[in-house]
């Protein structure tokens, strides 16, 4: 089984990461193609296409301009935000971290797909961002889907557990994915209607990754006992392809 999560806008390159053996992202040639486009934009253009402030546009213009000389860090330690903060990566044992390296993928607008210990440089590029004529979902879809097919073929339990947002999981082409996709939903009962509350769902996704790592879980079936923030598995609302956890 492999799980997928979305990359994060928030980064943490200030805090030192533990020393560990790092790996190289799979699709650097395609990443460099995107960088060439990003480097051609002015700060004002970056601000508009990314819908960010002038200050953030300046920061990212400088990052892209001198990208090769930027500091590198393992992806799992570089990303911050609600999902990554709730993995509590700094508390994982080396054994748990190594398990994640072979059971977790991070979907990225700039890198396509990353293993936890793949090195990245500071950047901002959401999957929904349009770069000239480049639709990032379409740009990455075949490459990422084919890559996932290859790595799942080597797994004993050939499941893809989707813990990513719709924006990022759309990079997986379900018509070309050869193995079972299992979507995970975290919902809450609000006025008699089941709804997804973004911030709580993100925290729960991160916590589920932590549970996968600490318990060496390689099957969706083993996640049905997961509980965090009051969420509990709902047999009634779930199916073979959908795991639904409801907060009472």
Swiss-Prot record:
Signal peptide residues on this chain, from the entry's feature table: none
Gene Ontology CC annotations of this record: cytosol
Biological process according to GO: response to hydroperoxide
A Pfam family hit: H2O2_YaaD
Transmembrane regions listed in the UniProt entry: none
Protein family membership: Belongs to the UPF0246 family.
Protein name per UniProt: UPF0246 protein RPR_00055
Organism field: Rickettsia peacockii (strain Rustic)
